[in-house]
Amino acid sequence: MPGPRSHEVGPAEARILMHKSRQVADAPVGDLATIRGLSARGPAGEIPLRLYDARAERGPGPVVLFMHGGGFVLGDLDTHDPFCAEIARLLDLPVIAVGYRLAPEHPWPAGVEDAIAAARWVAGSPDALGLAVTSLVTCGDSAGGNFAIVVSLALRDEPAAVPVLAQWPIYPAANPAKGYPSFQDFGEGYLLTHDAMRWFDDCYAPDPKDWRYSPMVKSQIGMPPTLVVTAGLDPIRDQGRAYAAACVEAGVPTVFREARGNIHGFINLRKAIPSSQADIEGCTEILKLLIAERTSA
């Protein structure tokens, strides 16, 4: 997309640009019975959340916990509003988006600690949520895909009040400390660039050996059924492919789906790239099958 690049203008201006791009590139939020703000107690104060539900009332069941992308630096509850509303409709499940702390103001591991805390809060079915949560489905795109995996690992090792039923990392930064061929193949001209990724990493300032940044340093044995989605023209495509392979090798029921001919960020580009709608719908159909298989067992 034309215009200044995130790494050229700094975090504050880059966040404004991301909001503006939603207005021209993404689909509208559309009708939904419930869109409601709430908050969870986090390690450094309140974590803003947003609940999306196609129903005004709902019985006990799974809840999708969504963590937005943006390189750990950009994005918020508003940038991914249309996507969260859409998957709430397509899955017919409540979706709760997490407004975690962003770098560089809050470097690693602040954001992922918020995501884990939010997951534990939602799992406890607090009165403020107004839902009887029986299980979680962790989900996120890009940096949020990293968080989805890390949250699943954290709750595998130290279980919450309810289990993680499935995970859905979308073009995840699953092994960001390792180089892969797709980084060179698609690092220029496909929206996400080499320079942007290096800038995100500098802002986030993670420990590359820590599983809360590089979740593939941990065994994936015992992880929930997993749907890994990549984009065919994405510099971090191969990270998602590698993560899917690691899950298969660990005996995790895994579905891998690649949006061929699409780019990083496509879930926020349904107006600019209309085929993204079909890519999203195909993913949700698979996820519904994974969830149904687990809930009927």
Task: Spell out what each predicted region is.
Residues 129-142:
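Alpha/beta-hydrolase fold nucleophile elbow
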Residues 41-43, 49-60, 216-220:
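Short beta-strand-to-loop junctions in surface cap/lid or active-site-entrance loops
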Residues 106-126:
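Alpha/beta-hydrolase active-site loop
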Residues 78-97:
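Short amphipathic alpha-helix adjacent to the substrate-entry channel of hydrolases
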